[in-house]
Amino acid sequence: MIMPTPFVSQLSPSLFTTLREQLEKKGFVISIPPHTVFQGRSSTVSCTVYQSGKIVVQGKGTQEFVEFFLEPEILHSFSIQNVQQDLRPRIGVDESGKGDFFGPLCTAGVYAPSIKSIESLYEITICDSKLISDAKIPSLARSIRSLCTCKVITLFPEKYNALYANFQNLNALLAWTHATIIDDLAPKPTGDVFAISDQFASSERVLLQAVRKKRADIELIQRHRAEQDVVVAAASILARDAFLSSMQTLESQYQVRLLKGASGKVKQQAKEILRDKGQPVLEKVCKTHFKTFYEVLGSTS
């Protein structure tokens, strides 16, 4: 497989702290290898700042990271050219929350029915929600809703846990939510409209079979890193917006603070909720099939 070409530039020392803080907010793991000021790593990209001021970005997510974050928000210069705009009407689907111990699973779909609607998504610089700060998500979500037809399924923990007990498999549950949204959004007849989704299972067959049970005639495209498609990216923003607002709802309802992710800090917080609120409340704010849940229960027995 041909790897993307690394991006190399020069970074002013005055921006070192700003970049590091922004990467930390995005969940990058920070380290300090020899001869560097720091290095930030995510699942798709590494960003290394050397003592000389040279900055090197590598990994399969390089272009998106540079085009939508590094250049506009840090460097304030532009060298990477936009890819050719795909203006075909289509449905994009994505989810948020599947890796978070606390909170819901949110799946969102966006149907961009016209060239104008897709051009508008490009104009407001829609990109993968993981490259956007949480503070910017709500306003972008409002813009997307004004431009496209949208659908969101939010499974709060109580409902999520019941469905997981039925499906016994996260990918099967994801396939059901994705297929339901595609069926709801697809025009009838489908015509030339197709659907695009991230390939979240090892086999494309998992989602394809779920879609075929509901809608036999729509073309389905599954890709790794599908969020690079502007309509899927729009769906990722809607899903993230639903996740963030739902977390606030749970925090208010149960008077607890809920951290995102599944880190050691999250585990410690779960222990505190179990101690202060009891197991029934913990089960209403978390995904009980996570190993963390059983570790927390075991630590108090």
UniProtKB/Swiss-Prot annotation:
Gene3D superfamilies noted in UniProt: Ribonuclease H-like superfamily/Ribonuclease H, TATA-Binding Protein
Co-factor binding details: Manganese or magnesium. Binds 1 divalent metal ion per monomer in the absence of substrate. May bind a second metal ion after substrate binding.
Gene name, Swiss-Prot/TrEMBL: rnhC
Identification of the protein by name: Ribonuclease HIII
Subcellular location: Cytoplasm
Reaction equation(s) it catalyzes: Endonucleolytic cleavage to 5'-phosphomonoester
Residues bound to a divalent metal cation: 94-95, 198
Membrane spanning residue stretches: none
Example of a GO cellular component annotation carried by this entry: cytoplasm
HAMAP family, A to Z: RNase_HIII
Cofactor(s) in the UniProt record: Mn(2+); Mg(2+)
Family indicated by similarity: Belongs to the RNase HII family. RnhC subfamily.
GO MF annotations, alphabetized: magnesium ion binding; RNA binding; RNA-DNA hybrid ribonuclease activity
Function: Endonuclease that specifically degrades the RNA of RNA-DNA hybrids.
Originating species: Chlamydia muridarum (strain MoPn / Nigg)
UniProt KW keywords: Cytoplasm, Endonuclease, Hydrolase, Magnesium, Metal-binding, Nuclease
Assigned EC number: 3.1.26.4
GO BP annotations, alphabetical order: DNA replication, removal of RNA primer; mismatch repair
